[in-house]
Amino acid sequence: MVGYKVLITASGLGSRLGNLTKFTNKGLVRIGKKPALSYIIESYPDDVEFVVTLGHYGRQVKQFLNLAYPDKNIKYVSVDNYDGDGSSLLYSMSLCKDELQCPFIFHACDTVVEKEEFDFSSNWVAGHKNGSSFQYRTLNVRNESLLKINEKGEEFFDYVYIGLCGIKDYELFWKYTDEILSETTVSSLSDCHVISKMMDHSEFSVVDYKTWYDIGNVDSLKKSR
């Protein structure tokens, strides 16, 4: 068994894809011959355990994964609020706390990368050299170590953040998740806000992903296809 689990958040509306997600989940949008979720699931070792959040067209997501991957170890977590006041990526992630009392990888369901060997000697975040800071949060880096996560629109940065990270210090992650959600419930809350707090106590390395396909918005989806 590998020593980590993989969290895939597949509960959001995918509103940046417009009409493409009006009748389906963005993780089921196809790139080539397969849905995005297939590329993600198949990029990990056979014996890894997945935790998948369900919300927008969650029944479709669960049915697809159960049919396509009957031998995979997949736990499902239903998100009660994925589009109303108080909803956020971080809120959805927080509902998985009980399932993720171990090191874990967070993998956004609109992020497709080539298969990698994951190192958990430290916490890490994944970056890509090319991308618009107006569409993505960005990373400032020194000697392959994370210095800062920037909000969208930052002019000076080294990488864009691709929605993929490894959390070795999971207890600290959940501690700060609880603290942040107790203070505010704005819809922009994400893993990045927790990582920024963790950096006062833990180091994060930055993994440079040369190949990255983002299906989270219409323009990048067209390029990925």
PLM ranges: what are they?
Residues 1-8, 16, 30, 34-103, ...:
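Conserved N-terminal catalytic core of the sugar/cofactor nucleotidyltransferase
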Residues 2-6, 160-225:
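Conserved alpha/beta core of the MobA/IspD/sugar-nucleotide pyrophosphorylase nucleotidyltransferase superfamily
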Residues 10, 54, 108, 128:
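Short beta-strand/turn micro-motifs composed of small residues
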Residues 12, 110, 217:
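Active-site glycine-centered loops adjacent to acidic/histidine catalytic or metal-binding residues
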Residues 81-87, 133-134, 155, 212-215:
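A short acidic, often aromatic-flanked loop/helix-cap motif at beta-alpha or helix-coil junctions
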Residues 103-112:
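Short beta-strand-to-loop acidic/aromatic patch adjacent to the donor-nucleotide binding site
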Residues 113-186:
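Conserved core of the sugar-phosphate nucleotidyltransferase
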